[in-house]
Curated annotation (Swiss-Prot):
The name this protein goes by in its record: Allatotropin
Keywords assigned: Amidation, Cleavage on pair of basic residues, Hormone, Ion transport, Neuropeptide, Secreted, Signal, Transport
Lineage: Eukaryota, Metazoa, Ecdysozoa, Arthropoda, Hexapoda
Stored InterPro entries: EF_Hand_1_Ca_BS (IPR018247)
Induction text: In the 5th instar larva isoform 1 is induced in the nerve cord by starvation, ingestion of the ecdysteroid agonist RH-5992 or parasitization with C.congregata.
């Protein structure tokens, strides 16, 4: 190769390098930094974005900021004004161990002398039959009739052998059911509900 050809190749290489250099710079300048949080260009100038622990420069009117504490509900303001202080506890998290004893339900303890343990009427299906008449009138006469048999069967049991006269007269006057049962048992022999002259005068 002669000298002119070498110079021509060198000039061509320099021109290629010169044309490629501005393109690389333009591509570097066109790249934008990645913005965090906002995609809108107008919202990229958010003041205080990403600042966590810096105090606010403006002092709000009715808010008194507290110092950050170790509790999870840090940064909750306390209000001085009664009108603003309606939402004083709004947003506060309940403490994990503070109200644990209040939430627990106390189980009942066994008290032997308690009235609740007595189940009155439990298991009773039917009530006792009510007796319309005078209690013991029919059984009274049956006892008189079967008194000899009872003496044979139960020697130790005291049998009814006599009735006081005053008690009998008083019961006949004041207790019509008792008087009716006496008449039916001793006078009305045929049990027809009618008293004949023979039944009334049979002992005379």
């Amino acid at each position: 190769m002669n000298l002119t050809m070498q110079l021509a190749v060198i000039v061509a290489v320099c021109l290629c390098l010169a044309e490629g250099a501005p393109d690389v710079r333009l591509t570097r300048t066109k790249q934008q930094r990645p913005t965090r949080g906002f995609k809108n260009v107008e919202m990229m100038t958010a003041r205080g974005f990403g600042k966590r622990d810096r105090p606010h420069p403006r002092a709000e009117r009715d808010v008194d900021h507290q110092a950050p504490s170790a509790r999870p509900n840090r940064g909750t303001p306390t209000f001085k004004s009664p009108t603003v202080g309606i939402a004083r506890d709004f947003g506060k998290r309940a403490s994990q161990y503070g109200n644990e004893e209040e939430i627990r339900v106390t189980r009942g303890t066994f008290k032997p002398n308690s009235n609740i343990l007595i189940a009155r009427g439990y298991g009773k299906r039917t009530q006792l039959p009510q007796i319309d008449g005078v209690y013991g009138l029919d059984n009274f006469w049956e006892m008189l009739e079967t008194s000899p048999e009872r003496e044979v069967q139960e020697v130790d049991e005291k049998t009814l052998e006599s009735i006081p006269l005053d008690w009998f007269v008083n019961e006949m006057l004041n207790n019509p059911d008792f008087a009716r049962s006496v008449v039916r048992k001793f006078i009305d022999l045929n049990q027809d509900g009618m008293l004949s002259s023979e039944e009334l005068l049979r002992n005379f």
